[in-house]
């Protein structure tokens, strides 16, 4: 498996484009084939999520996706649902598709009616620009950005020639439970919808569900996975693990980019938890660490306050014993042990620790010494800018 350029347009049979002339943007992705989806577990659900979930569960295939940024079309009642349907119908009519095979996604401010006239005005330009170049993938990725500072796309080619690519957006309001978080993934493997669904759920659980920026689960979270089947390669039973691994690789890349691009963030935090008795325990501890405001604040201040890490692990609800804990911080290729088997380490190099804390990526390694299970979670520091961005979001 190798990383390749091109984002979603690296996948055979995918064309895309997007524009963002102001606060609102529009992206369209044209790719036909079996499809699967994972959606927010928030009980307040945006209209596009309701519509797209119904279509995935009924049709198990997609021909296109239309996404807008700048307005979430959430908490907008029946009118919002009709607006989402109209968006799908406009794409279907212009491209000669069945509207039931067009998914809709939105991201932005909650509780405001979507300006459908904006979609009508600019959709022709987007459809005219549809193409399969790397620039077209980037244009679509840029169009769905809100408070994101960096474009998020990733693609790999498996040894068998199958390609998997995805674009995503997300920087705030991220704690997916399948953070706002949208992802559109594509492959050219010749696989049915049930295989896509199984691979998607595994990959999302290991990656996007392990990202925490601010602990808020959005009304609009959505991950869609479509196969164009254009490679002609049907992964055999022996290759399905490679297929799932490829999707996990793409999603891990995007998950880390989301965490690093958290609103106002200056540092990526990666919590690696090992030695858990159960996988769920490892997940709980890792996510609790990166969710902790005290840990996030300490990382922002370059303060190696490891007590906050063990405290977070302790209240996570996971099974652990403090006498067994071993903790270290690492970054920039260096590592300092802080706790060993429940005792404060006497080998800590404070000058090296200070150097590690100055890195823009900090890894927290915690061994529970209870078993063999492990998990990794990603988050970011909590900064003054996070408060400013979210205090001024609608004003």
UniProtKB/Swiss-Prot annotation:
Q: What GO terms describe the biological role, i.e. biological process, of this protein?
A: L-arginine biosynthetic process; ornithine biosynthetic process
In this chain, the site described as Involved in the stabilization of negative charge on the oxyanion by the formation of the oxyanion hole is at: 107-108
Could you say which EC number(s) this protein's record lists? 2.3.1.35
Which is one Gene Ontology cellular component term of this protein? cytoplasm
Q: Give its localization.
A: Cytoplasm
Q: Enumerate the UniProt keywords alphabetically.
A: Acyltransferase, Amino-acid biosynthesis, Arginine biosynthesis, Autocatalytic cleavage, Cytoplasm, Transferase
Indicate yes or no for the key word Acyltransferase. yes
Record keyword Phosphoprotein present: no
Q: Name one Pfam family in it.
A: ArgJ
**Domain of life, per lineage:** Archaea
Q: Pathway, per Swiss-Prot/TrEMBL?
A: Amino-acid biosynthesis; L-arginine biosynthesis; L-ornithine and N-acetyl-L-glutamate from L-glutamate and N(2)-acetyl-L-ornithine (cyclic): step 1/1
> Where does this protein hold substrate?
146, 169, 180, 263, 390, 395
Coarse class of the primary localization is cytoplasm
The residues annotated as site (Cleavage) are 179-180
What GO molecular functions are on record for this protein? Answer: glutamate N-acetyltransferase activity; L-glutamate N-acetyltransferase activity
Q: Which residues form the active site?
A: 180
Q: Which reaction does it catalyse?
A: N(2)-acetyl-L-ornithine + L-glutamate = N-acetyl-L-glutamate + L-ornithine
Q: Which InterPro entries match?
A: Arg_biosynth_ArgJ (IPR002813), ArgJ-like_dom_sf (IPR016117), ArgJ_beta_C (IPR042195)
- Family, per the entry? Belongs to the ArgJ family.
Q: How does it assemble?
A: Heterotetramer of two alpha and two beta chains.
Role of this protein? Catalyzes the transfer of the acetyl group from N(2)-acetylornithine to glutamate, forming N-acetylglutamate and L-ornithine.
PANTHER family (UniProt xref): ARGININE BIOSYNTHESIS BIFUNCTIONAL PROTEIN ARGJ (PTHR23100), ARGININE BIOSYNTHESIS BIFUNCTIONAL PROTEIN ARGJ, MITOCHONDRIAL (PTHR23100:SF0)
Name of this chain's protein: Glutamate N-acetyltransferase
């Amino acid at each position: 498996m190798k990383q390749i350029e091109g984002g979603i347009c690296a996948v055979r049979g995918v064309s895309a484009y997007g524009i963002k002339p102001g606060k609102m943007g529009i992206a369209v992705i044209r790719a036909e084939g079996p499809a699967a989806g994972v959606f927010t577990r928030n009980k307040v659900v945006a209209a596009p999520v309701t519509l797209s979930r119904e279509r995935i569960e009924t049709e198990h295939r997609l021909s296109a996706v239309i996404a807008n940024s700048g307005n979430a079309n959430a908490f907008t009642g029946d009118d919002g649902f009709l607006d989402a349907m109209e968006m799908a119908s406009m794409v279907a009519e212009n491209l000669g598709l069945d509207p039931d095979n067009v998914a809709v996604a939105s991201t932005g401010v909650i509780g405001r009616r979507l300006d459908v006239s904006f979609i009508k005005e600019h959709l022709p330009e987007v459809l005219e620009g549809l193409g399969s170049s790397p620039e077209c993938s980037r244009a679509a990725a840029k169009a769905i950005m809100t408070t994101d500072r960096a474009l998020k796309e990733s693609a790999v080619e498996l040894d068998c020639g199958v390609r998997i690519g995805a674009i995503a957006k997300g920087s705030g309001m991220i704690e997916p439970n399948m953070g706002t978080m949208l992802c559109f993934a594509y492959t050219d493997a010749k696989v049915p919808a049930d295989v896509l669904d199984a691979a998607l759920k595994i990959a999302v659980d290991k990656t996007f569900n392990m990202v925490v920026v601010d602990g808020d689960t959005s009304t609009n979270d959505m991950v869609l996975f479509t196969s164009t089947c254009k490679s002609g390669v049907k992964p055999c039973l022996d290759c399905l693990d490679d297929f799932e691994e490829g999707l996990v690789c793409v999603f891990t890349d995007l998950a880390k980019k989301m965490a690093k691009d958290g609103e106002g963030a200056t540092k990526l935090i990666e919590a690696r938890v090992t030695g858990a008795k159960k996988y769920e325990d490892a997940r709980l501890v890792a996510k609790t660490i990166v969710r902790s405001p005290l840990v996030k604040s300490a990382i922002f201040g370059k303060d190696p306050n490891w007590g906050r890490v063990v405290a977070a692990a302790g209240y996570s609800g996971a099974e652990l014993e403090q006498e067994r804990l071993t903790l270290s911080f690492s970054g920039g290729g260096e590592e300092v042990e802080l706790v060993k088997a429940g005792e404060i380490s006497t080998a800590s190099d404070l000058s090296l620790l200070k150097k590690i804390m100055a890195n823009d990526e900090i890894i927290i390694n915690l061994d529970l010494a209870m078993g063999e299970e492990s998990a990794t979670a990603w988050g970011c520091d909590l900064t003054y800018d996070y408060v400013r961005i979210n205090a001024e979001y609608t004003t």
